[in-house]
């Protein structure tokens, strides 16, 4: 047996379905589309969400919320993430280099999730009240 002699097991591969190629193929004439109607015509299919003229669901429900334009430029960083960092001073550049925030991010906020056991100085980042308390309890500080 050699690599150029290998063949797939019998019945494991199927030929591509060729529709509309004669009666003997089993998929000739109407080519599996049935008789008449919109779905049998070429290009004849409704758009996504169309409900046959009934008011579609996306129009029956009220509008809600909005897409924030600043979402891509803001980020959250947890105390758990900061604990894993080697740096004693943490700022936006350090977070970007560590891959904790994206390159487009312009401002980040530290949130209280996880524990902080070492002294850390936070520069130029926001912090929640709980995160501030945890950072200061560990001997760290938040610089403006």
Swiss-Prot record:
Record's subunit section: Part of the 50S ribosomal subunit.
Pfam family, one: Ribosomal_L27A
GO biological process: translation
Keywords, comma-separated and alphabetical: Ribonucleoprotein, Ribosomal protein, RNA-binding, rRNA-binding
Molecular function in Gene Ontology: rRNA binding; structural constituent of ribosome
Annotated Gly residues bias: 21-31
GO terms under cellular component: cytosolic large ribosomal subunit
Protein name: Large ribosomal subunit protein uL15
Family: Belongs to the universal ribosomal protein uL15 family.
Annotated stretches, region: Disordered: 1-48
Function comment: Binds to the 23S rRNA.
